[in-house]
A protein has these predicted regions:
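FMN-binding flavodoxin-like domain, especially the glycine-rich phosphate-binding loop
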Residues: 1-89, 145-153, 158-173
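Iron-sulfur cluster-binding cysteine motifs and their immediate structural context
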Residues: 96, 101, 105-122, 126, ...
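A mid-sequence, solvent-exposed acidic-amphipathic segment
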Residues: 74-111
Length: 173
């Protein structure tokens, strides 16, 4: 399963299927779901929504039927081999305004654990710009204003507003 912010999931499903197969798993199904983009709430707004949830229900029934019918093949998913290369790593960290109350919700919610629990303004290298800290801050004190991030937001808001639908893949279907 891949969750993405209404742009594209690139090779994520293929990479996941490959990793699981390398570990000896048969992967009968895969899906790419749309969620609100982490950098801007204007892209993928309100997703997943009721329409998505109906599609998820239908997909889960198809997967259950495939598994119960002793489906033993691995699903074919889109993607590229070799996988699309990663862009160069750029050390961009969120900033913290004076309105920070040191509640530490940002540190608690950071999946990379790069925000210090001693001082929310101290952020180690390793931020993936998921914006969990920005979204969890009750004071709006966490933010990104770096040119690189703002440029990406502008590109997303210009090119990725059209609704994309979840994509589902079931072996033998």
């Amino acid at each position: 399963m891949a969750v993405y912010g209404n742009r594209h999931y690139d090779d994520a499903l293929l990479e996941a299927v490959d990793i699981l197969q390398e570990q000896g798993f048969t992967v009968p199904a895969a899906a790419a779901f749309v969620a609100e983009h982490s950098l801007t709430p204007k892209v993928g707004t309100g997703r997943p929504d009721a329409r998505d949830m109906v599609a998820v229900g239908d997909f889960s029934q198809n997967v259950a039927a495939a598994v119960l019918s002793a489906c033993c093949s691995t699903v074919t998913v889109p993607g590229n081999r070799p996988y699309r290369g990663l862009p160069p790593v750029v050390d961009i960290r969120p900033k913290t305004s004076q309105s920070c109350t040191q509640c530490m919700l940002c540190a608690t919610n950071c999946p990379m654990q790069v925000i210090s629990f001693d001082d929310a303004a101290k952020i180690s290298q390793g931020c993936i710009r998921c914006c969990a800290c920005v979204r969890s801050c009750p004071e709006g004190a966490k933010y990104f204003d770096q040119e690189q991030v703002l440029n990406i937001v502008n590109i997303l808001e210009k090119n990725c507003l059209t609704r994309r639908e979840p994509e589902f893949f079931v072996a033998g279907a």
